[in-house]
Regions:
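Core catalytic lobe of class I
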Residues: 1-210
Length: 210
């Protein structure tokens, strides 16, 4: 069953007194997309839409923060989320290459045990003449304390390959493919509860229910 709450996830998590969660799987605003303050302060449609046409998807908040503000926000939210999780729960968070150092700091400051970094290979994205193609995003994962080796969870890949969502299926500027989210959700215990503080297009919610 999907339960959707609209509001500041920090306020929600601070007051939540329901069942504990078995996994946190989420895709926060990256707050990167530029080398300078002016570039990072651009709208999300300017940063993440690879076309000169008007972007049909609305801009979203939280993507214009400086690095310290973003680190503080993420550490705060991940700490609040961990309190609402069972021991041994799993954390999975998307990011781009610029934010890996900050995100891994936030994960550990929040009390999670960092376990590794995964790769989403987007296949043919972002060609740049004279440079390596920026076709990957990254996923930091961790656990709330020990992670028993005998959990009823299969061996999962460390690299996920799928193109960006296109056409009529796309409803969000930074939407993650549901096929990838279905694979990632398998890290959660069968029948477990998954928390997504940054719901976005709802890919995690849809994948978790399948």
């Amino acid at each position: 069953m999907i339960e959707l709450y609209n509001g500041d996830c920090r306020a929600f998590l601070s007051n939540y007194n329901g069942e504990r969660f078995d996994a946190v799987i989420t895709d926060p605003p990256y707050a990167s997309g530029g080398a300078t303050l002016s570039e990072r302060s651009a709208s999300t449609s300017q940063k993440y839409t690879a076309t000169k046409k008007a972007c049909p998807f609305p801009d979203f908040m939280g993507d214009q923060m400086d690095s310290r503000s973003w680190l503080h926000m993420m550490a705060d939210i991940l700490a609040l989320a961990r309190v609402q999780c069972h021991d041994g729960a799993v954390l999975v968070v998307f990011c781009d290459w610029r934010q890996i150092p900050l995100l891994t700091d936030a994960v550990q400051w929040a009390g999670w045990q960092w376990r590794g970094t995964l790769v989403w290979d987007k296949l043919t994205s972002r060609p740049q003449k004279g440079r390596f193609r920026q076709q990957a995003e990254f996923v930091v994962w961790a656990s709330n304390g020990k992670l028993p080796i005998d959990r009823p969870v299969p061996v999962l890949p460390g690299v996920f390959r799928a193109a960006n969502v296109q056409g009529v299926q796309r409803i969000h500027q930074t939407q993650k493919p549901e096929e990838i989210m279905r694979q990632i959700c398998k890290i959660c215990l069968p029948g477990g509860r998954i928390l997504d503080p940054f719901a976005g297009s709802g890919s995690t919610l849809a994948a978790a229910e399948l």
